[in-house]
Amino acid sequence: MIRWDKRIKLLFLLPAVIWVLALTIAPLFFSLYLSFTDVKREVVITGVEEIPILDKEGNPKTRSDGSIRTKKVKQKELQIKYDWVGFKKYKRVVNDKEYQDAAKFTFIYVIISVFVEIVLGLFLAFLFNRRIYGRGFMRSLMILPIFATPFAIGFMFFTILFEVSGPLAWMGIPFLSNHNWAPFSVMLVDIWQWTPFCFLVFLAALQGIPDDLIEAATLATKSAYKIWTSVILPLLQPIIVLVILLRVAESAKLYDYIASLTKGGPGTATQSVSFLVFNKAFKMNDFGYASAGSFLMLIVVMIFVMLFFTRLRKTYE
């Protein structure tokens, strides 16, 4: 009976396992293989076929002797060849100035946007954790941006920041066409959408702190700053770490805002790694370069996560 129960549990897990293997693990290994190859797509003529020549009404044309007029059409087939090149693509990516600029922008983007989201999320959570009038309505209103798609929000901000006919055109600031302003415009969109997520998680964590603990801290000191830094923040540290990891992993995949706001411009000022490798793969057909660039970014994010957890473990020890 126990063995049968285990089989039933495994049977229920099987669809999820197949889903992960088919849509996550298999594409990941195939992408890794592509990063060591030079993918070439060639149109090969496989034969010649004679087909009838049709008139305007769709009927076959005939000769004077009654035979059907035909024409020869080449049969073509798209063939994909994978030439093994080893680490050639990785060397090319590392030495590519365009990739270096994209990685630099992505790194700065992640650091600034995640930092601002964490700080604003903590501040808003502390503010709305108090009993203030209209707290429930404002709380519901603030989380609405989370439910919108990033591309739709990017397009909405494009209409707002468009310096020719947008609502903010009167300011005369080139939000999207200036290489200094454009990166911060993209960061603004990310901060606007994902600060409510940080706020919601931190608010739930704050409400989980026992009131007795806060009252005991209040008796020990009247300073709200000391209570916040000595009691509340240490208790929130695991949640803050979790939110940072989630936001770093998500922000590093930056694509939607750029595709809907700046298209990577002006020039390459707002071109992220994801946007660059997408263009390399699907516009220039350089799948090896795109896969190598993606895996290098994945390695950097994994190293960051490992160092972060190592540092956190030492702190708790």
Roles of regions detected by a PLM:
Residues 2-317:
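A structural signal for multi-pass alpha-helical bundles of membrane permease subunits
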